[in-house]
């Protein structure tokens, strides 16, 4: 699949780390570092603009290493970039740790996964089909 991209950043285009990677790392595009304080959130520019084909979205997800090592996540995870959005991709990061986190220019801050999606149509009914699970949720299967 080809995706049109404008790269106004100082960095190379995102790429897959391996042949089986689902996501591409996205880098911060900053004129100066950002200090993200504990429990603070900020919008981090990437300098990337894309045009996805109809029927696709780009999901912005946290990087697992930043999450476990530094407590840094994507606040609206996954963030969705719709196929008709043409603005700059910016990432909402949140610091869930107890220490300041410095975001440097070029740092890999999130990953992007391109995914197909469908539009759904609502079909109003009076009763839903029964299933074995039923209304069970939020830990209904217990600890095993």
Curated annotation (Swiss-Prot):
CDD domains per the UniProt record, alphabetical: trimeric_dUTPase
Short name of any one Pfam family annotated for the protein: dUTPase
Catalysed reactions listed for this entry: dUTP + H2O = dUMP + diphosphate + H(+)
Gene behind this protein: dut
Protein name (record): Deoxyuridine 5'-triphosphate nucleotidohydrolase
Family statement: Belongs to the dUTPase family.
Listed pathway(s): Pyrimidine metabolism; dUMP biosynthesis; dUMP from dCTP (dUTP route): step 2/2
Cofactors named for this entry: Mg(2+)
